[in-house]
Amino acid sequence: MMMKFINIGYGNMVSAARIITIVSPDSAPIKRIIQDAREKGKLVDATHGRRTRAVIITDSDHVILSSVQPETVANRLYGSDDFSEEG
């Protein structure tokens, strides 16, 4: 079985099969989703202290913050800029 991982910046990877959506963090509803995830302990901050540019929501209700643009993450998801692991 082949698992596809997407690089979300600074050596961090997310399973492509678990991603539901990739959005910009600028709108008020997304900011509320981030705050709710923080309170529930389901927030993963992969920005390494940099500005959040993309918010990735997974099927397990985890919210992942990335400093990579949403368009870049989407291109990696649907393009050839990905990593695979057999397992």
UniProtKB/Swiss-Prot annotation:
Q: Name one Pfam family in it.
A: RemA-like
- What InterPro entries does UniProt report for this protein, alphabetically? RemA-like
Matches recorded under HAMAP family: RemA (MF_01503)
Q: Which family does it belong to?
A: Belongs to the RemA family.
Q: Which protein, by its recorded name, is this?
A: Putative regulatory protein GTNG_1019
User: Which species expresses this protein natively?
Assistant: Geobacillus thermodenitrificans (strain NG80-2)
